[in-house]
């Protein structure tokens, strides 16, 4: 049985990213590969023969998905997903790229204007795949050869100067004003005044013709006049209540109720007038004349003929010529 050797070194080697042979002007490349690529050393050796080791980094997709790797920000010009040129590992890479945590690490590490593509060239062609949707949601733009990170210009604060503190010249030089000859043009006849005839439209002379006014009654036929008036449901009185007209009554109920109230008031006034007594209808009590009685017909005849509420109840009959006055409902003889 052959011995098993474990490689415990980190995949991210800082010496490779900041080596003596690297330069900030040289484009940097990040290779991301599915886990199955790690078992093929010849495959990795062939990749580093194409991409220089001093400007290229290699990471595994499963370690990116697990959050075990930290990538520098805005460093790589190209991120290449290894799937083999024949696409034999495309399904494995697509499954890992469907994880949003992978894109949250790859997109910040990509420079503005940098590209992210797959080795077989199929990544980004179909924008309906799960990995394409995650790339677009992360901020990349799909293209024919993969995805591109937009180059957004950095925000800059620009001060606004409104010219409030402008320096003024204490002795400004004023250019002489050249006199301009005034050109006088004669107005043509009929121009320059307006004559208004207000009598044509406003009819201020008081003569108003009703030629354009249509009488509404002429629009009704005999059948319309004989037709009974349809009472609206809202005008119908509720049980136990008096029928009342609406505020904007148009069915004639308000006029009819007003006429009924007026007739009722006239009848009540007529009945009230019949109960009023005139001066000649009043009977004056004159005790100086023998045989005269009060309005009740028995006040001067004695106690037996006085009313129940008479203040002189219990007193003897009045004498002829006797003056009688009442003060506070008390007889004063």
Curated annotation (Swiss-Prot):
Positions of [2Fe-2S] cluster binding: 235, 246, 249, 251
Residue numbers spanned by region Fe-S binding site B: 296-310
Chain spans, region Linker: 159-225
Location(s), subcellular: Cytoplasm; Mitochondrion intermembrane space
GO molecular function, one term: 2 iron, 2 sulfur cluster binding
Region (N-terminal SAM-like domain), start-end ranges: 23-158
Region described as Disordered: spans on this chain: 1-29
Chain intervals for the UniProt region annotation (Fe-S binding site A): 235-251
Binding site for [4Fe-4S] cluster: 296, 299, 307, 310
Motif placement: Cx2C motif 2: 307-310
Domain of life of the source: Eukaryota
Cofactor(s) in the UniProt record: [2Fe-2S] cluster; [4Fe-4S] cluster
Record-level GO cellular component terms: cytoplasm; mitochondrial intermembrane space
Gene Ontology BP annotations: iron-sulfur cluster assembly
Motif Cx2C motif 1: where in chain: 296-299
Role, per record: Component of the cytosolic iron-sulfur (Fe-S) protein assembly (CIA) machinery required for the maturation of extramitochondrial Fe-S proteins. Part of an electron transfer chain functioning in an early step of cytosolic Fe-S biogenesis, facilitating the de novo assembly of a [4Fe-4S] cluster on the scaffold complex cfd1-nbp35. Electrons are transferred to dre2 from NADPH via the FAD- and FMN-containing protein tah18.
Domain notes: The C-terminal domain binds 2 Fe-S clusters but is otherwise mostly in an intrinsically disordered conformation. The N-terminal domain has structural similarity with S-adenosyl-L-methionine-dependent methyltransferases, but does not bind S-adenosyl-L-methionine. It is required for correct assembly of the 2 Fe-S clusters.
Protein family according to the UniProt entry: Belongs to the anamorsin family.
Name of the protein in question: Fe-S cluster assembly protein dre2
Gene: dre2
């Amino acid at each position: 049985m052959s011995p098993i050797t474990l490689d415990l070194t980190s995949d991210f080697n800082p010496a490779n990213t900041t080596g003596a042979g690297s330069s900030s002007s040289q484009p940097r490349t990040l290779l991301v590969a599915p886990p199955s690529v790690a078992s093929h050393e010849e495959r990795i050796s062939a990749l580093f023969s194409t991409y220089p080791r001093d400007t290229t980094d290699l990471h595994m997709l499963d370690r990116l998905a697990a959050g075990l790797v930290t990538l520098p920000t805005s460093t790589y010009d190209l991120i290449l997903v290894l799937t083999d040129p024949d696409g034999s590992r495309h399904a494995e890479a697509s499954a890992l790229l469907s994880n949003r945590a992978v894109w949250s690490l790859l997109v910040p590490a990509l420079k503005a204007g940098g590209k992210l593509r797959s080795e077989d060239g199929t990544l980004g062609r179909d924008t309906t795949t799960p990995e394409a949707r995650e790339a677009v949601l992360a901020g990349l733009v799909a293209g024919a050869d993969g995805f591109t990170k937009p180059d957004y210009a950095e925000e800059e604060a620009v001060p606004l100067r409104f010219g409030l503190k402008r320096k003024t010249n204490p002795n400004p030089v004023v250019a002489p004003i050249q006199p301009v000859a005034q050109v006088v043009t004669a107005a043509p006849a009929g121009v320059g005044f307006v004559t208004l005839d207000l009598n044509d439209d406003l009819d201020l002379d008081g003569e108003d013709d009703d030629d354009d006014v249509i009488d509404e009654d002429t629009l009704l036929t005999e059948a319309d006049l004989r037709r009974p008036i349809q009472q609206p449901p809202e005008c119908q009185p509720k049980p136990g209540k008096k029928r009342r007209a609406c505020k904007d009554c148009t069915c004639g109920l308000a006029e009819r109720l007003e006429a009924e109230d007026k007739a009722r008031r006239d009848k009540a006034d007529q009945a009230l007038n019949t109960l009023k007594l005139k001066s000649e209808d009043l009977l004056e009590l004159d005790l100086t004349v023998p045989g005269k009685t009060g309005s009740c017909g028995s006040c001067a005849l004695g106690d037996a003929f006085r009313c129940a509420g008479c203040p002189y109840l219990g007193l003897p009959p009045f004498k002829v010529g006797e003056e009688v006055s009442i003060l506070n409902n008390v007889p004063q003889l």
